[in-house]
Amino acid sequence: MLTIKQITENTDAVLRGLEKKHFKNAKETIAQVLDFNDKRKANQTILDKNLAEANSLSKSIGQLMKEGKKEEAEAAKSRVAELKEVNKDLQANMDQAANDLQTLLYTIPNVPYDSVPEGVGADDNVVEKIGGMETELPKDALPHWELAKKYDLIDFDLGVKITGAGFPVYKGKGAQLQRALINFFLDEARKSGYTEIMPPTVVNAASGYGTGQLPDKEGQMYHCEVDDLYLIPTAEVPVTNIYRDVILDEKQLPIKNCAYTQCFRREAGSYGKDVRGLNRLHEFSKVELVRIDKPEHSKQSHQEMLDHVEGLLQKLELPYRILRLCGGDMSFTAALCFDFEVYSEAQKRWLEVSSVSNFDTYQANRLKCRYRTAEKKTELCHTLNGSALALPRIVAALLENNQTPEGIRIPKALVPYTGCLLY
């Protein structure tokens, strides 16, 4: 979340940023934040004054008794008791103001960087780069859901029987392809210096608030109400929360973690042709990169993550493009985000396979994730993460773009993992 210092010292800049993100009632919300903060400070000033007075009186009581000034000593005792009661009310008011302030801050999104373009939605995103070679397929090329059925790779109907729509069953070589991609992505991350983490796939509410999925995305998360736990929408949540309430040494940075997990998203309101097959699922596999760094290094870290994801797509021989997201299409928590999309030749559309984001200090402030400098100062870290990669649409693109009369061609980079050139 935004810090009080950010809001009080840069109010106009914060408001401009929130307007770029199309955050409703930005002026009213920030005015409330400032009001709650003023009340908290006013009560703190009175409380500090009262505590100083009570402390001074308490010290004087013994001396007054020695001097035989019993009435003055009793008056001092009475005043100390009175101040204690007043201070209880002041502390209660301060606690309530702090709670109200915290609740309000949780509802305010991150402020985008100046380099984020203006815009309302996906149509306003800026194409930064197009790479890879588009595949020329015959007019009767099949979409991936038909290829999956033809080669008995994925059974969507069986998933509906077992669970419901959006929970496919991978079979035979389809399951092997999933495992091949997961191992390939993890191996590539390891080569780039990432330490693999195997985290839980359920988290508590504190973790959801720490990375910003709560309260913003609560309606899109699967909630186990009996135990008050949430199925993770991405490994970002448990991996980043490893560093909640942690003060790191400067020499430990950057931290580079990767994790493969199943991810769960309700995707409420999704329907139509764009959600067919693997295009949008409730459960899917993904490898996630998480980095924690010093503020002055986070731009470089972000670029290194972008280069890593681009390298994966190049090795998979897929046509891709990189988008700089506009303010209106960015996530609640991001300060800067780039999306990677692969082209689906059979569907004639682009499919998002990765978002790589810099959160500045937004998540770190929620998490209380800090580092100690060489000068012994404590500063908030910058957090970054990105998919490397999400499997469903990668599988869709691989099947569609590599279909041949003989079967599905496997990219050279995956052959060591699949053991064959053709499915």
Where are these regions (language model features)?
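N-terminal alpha-helical targeting/anchoring segments
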Residues: 1-135, 153, 157
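TRNA-recognition modules of translation machinery and tRNA-sensing kinases, especially anticodon-binding
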Residues: 27, 129-422
